[in-house]
Design a protein with these regions (language model features):
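Secondary-structure boundary/capping motif
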Residues: 14-18, 69, 135
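Short amphipathic alpha-helices in soluble, non-transmembrane regions
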Residues: 20-26, 70-77
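Flexible, gly/pro- and Lys/Arg-enriched active-site loops
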Residues: 36, 45-54, 65, 71, ...
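Glycine-rich and small/hydrophobic secondary-structure elements
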Residues: 62
Length: 159
């Protein structure tokens, strides 16, 4: 089994419910199990600010799937929950990002793992640190150190 960390985000159609539905859907992915779920956090949007705040979380999975097959399942979950890919950084019902996939480094047309912006985003670092406090991002460093550098003060823990 490979340890995988997934970033979840939503700011449309009752975001907390969207995240809960996505976690249940991830439990149905073949050869994959949900191990841990972080608390949910409210955060300001990245990009255009004329949209609702986001609700974010991180989930730890164990999987036997390849990263690309897992991505297919995650994108299917996004689509089932009404995800539309119209505007970069636009409002969305659901965003599921593979943050880390074991110790693999992947850089192709479909995937960049570790997720290319995760080290700059408090809304990823704080929930990731909550469920994986010893996390090291390959080529970047310890999540706990990055959190000290990043301003995660604007995050509000919801549940």
């Amino acid at each position: 089994m490979i340890k995988v960390y997934i970033g979840l985000g939503s700011n449309l159609d009752v975001p907390q419910s969207q995240l809960k539905k996505a976690i249940i859907a991830m439990e149905m992915v073949p050869s994959t199990s949900v191990v841990k779920t972080s608390s949910f956090y409210r955060s300001k949007p990245v990009g255009p600010q004329d949209q609702p705040d986001y609700v974010n979380a991180v989930v730890e999975l164990d999987t036997e799937l390849s990263a690309s097959v897992l991505l297919d399942y995650l994108q299917a979950i996004e689509n089932e929950q009404g995800r539309e890919r119209k505007i970069k950084w636009g409002a969305r019902t659901l965003d599921l990002d593979i943050l880390l996939f074991g110790d693999e480094i992947i850089n192709n047309d479909r995937l960049q793992i570790p997720h290319v912006e995760m080290h700059n985003r408090g809304f990823v670092l704080l929930p990731l640190n909550e469920i994986f406090p010893d996390c090291m991002i390959p080529g970047v460093g310890a999540v706990s150190s990055l959190l000290q550098e990043d301003n995660a003060d604007d995050l509000v823990k919801l549940i």
